[in-house]
Amino acid sequence: MATTAGEQANYLQSADSMSDGRQHHPEEAGEKKQEEQKKSWGEWLQDLKIFIWNPEKKEVLGRDKKSWALILLFYFILYCFLAGLFALCIYGLLATISPYVPTYRDRVFPPGLTIRPQFNALYFSFNPSDRSTWSSHAESLNTFLEDYNDEIQQEKNLECTPGKYFFQPGEDHEERKACQFRRSLLKNCSGIEDPTFGFAQGKPCILLKMNRIVGYQAGSGIPIYVTCEILKADASYLGPVNFYPSDKFDLMYYPYYGKLTHVNYTSPLIAMQFTEVKNNQDINIQCKINGKDIISDHDKDRFLGRVAFTLHIG
């Protein structure tokens, strides 16, 4: 029994000491924390300097030269591999794509229409007696038609046979010839005899152009023609429309072989001159192309095969 009592006493004493030890640990942690908080800015700065460059261990940012050499070598190899993989993918992609002919053309829509001059929100308003309201449009048309000057066309392009396609077989990379479209063909809307393009007389000219599509055979053998109509108003407000050189896009300007090979190609134009538009009225006009395989009533694309604009002559 005595021995047992002694063992119990020793056990209680050791338990007390362990309890005292556990009670002292939080105090020691708190003291360490206070010591860290008591560090001055100078000490923090010194620690930072040591971290950046440790002269004793010869370390930069915690790494010696061997460690830095290994990690830089690793990233060099990694990025070289990624760059090579990227270059291989680009090469494979470019090897399957021709720069001359689009790869997929089975879902290409018929061409859209654009007009010149370009004006904001397709609302064209001017006063014939006020030059400032239309001079910029006349200048825009003159600049646009510079490539169509007769001298340039006769020097660079061929005089082709009207009414038939101008096929030019050969390799995709071979340069193709282009047919002449001389500026003088636009007559009253050429800007040659009348540099105001009819604006000064209240008889404005507007140019119509089809978008280019590589390989497209316009009209499937029958020339595409243009019609214009007034929307939501009396047809007499629009009056007659004169078309130059005609209301048709001649087949000899098709097919188009692409920008890289058809270098001197100039898109055929149709000039529309509105000679008897009712003044001081907003005239909503829609012009569209008509022909085989032409879509001009697409609900989601108002420029597919047609173009609508508002004309107001003050």
From Swiss-Prot:
Any one biological process term the GO annotation gives: proton transmembrane transport
Free-text tissue specificity from the UniProt record: Expressed in skeletal muscle, liver, lung, kidney, heart, brain and skin.
Q: Which cysteines are joined by disulfide bonds?
A: 160-179, 189-205, 228-287
The places in or outside the cell where this protein is found are:
Membrane
Q: How does it sit in the membrane?
A: Single-pass type II membrane protein
Cytoplasmic compartment spans: 1-69
Glycan attachment positions: 188, 264
One of the Pfam families matching this protein, by short name? Na_K-ATPase
Which stretches are tagged as biased composition: Polar residues? 1-17
Q: Among the entry's GO cellular component annotations, what is one? A: sodium:potassium-exchanging ATPase complex
Per UniProt, the keywords (alphabetical) are:
Disulfide bond, Glycoprotein, Hydrogen ion transport, Ion transport, Membrane, Signal-anchor, Transmembrane, Transmembrane helix, Transport
- Keyword Transport set for record: yes
Q: Where is the composition biased (Basic and acidic residues)?
A: 19-37
Quaternary assembly = Composed of two subunits: alpha (catalytic) and beta (accessory).
- Please state which protein family the record places this protein in: Belongs to the X(+)/potassium ATPases subunit beta family.
Q: What does this protein do?
A: This is the non-catalytic component of the active enzyme, which catalyzes the hydrolysis of ATP coupled with the exchange of Na(+) and K(+) ions across the plasma membrane.
Name recorded for this polypeptide: Protein ATP1B4
Q: Which organism is it from?
A: Xenopus laevis
Classification from the root reads: Eukaryota, Metazoa, Chordata, Craniata, Vertebrata
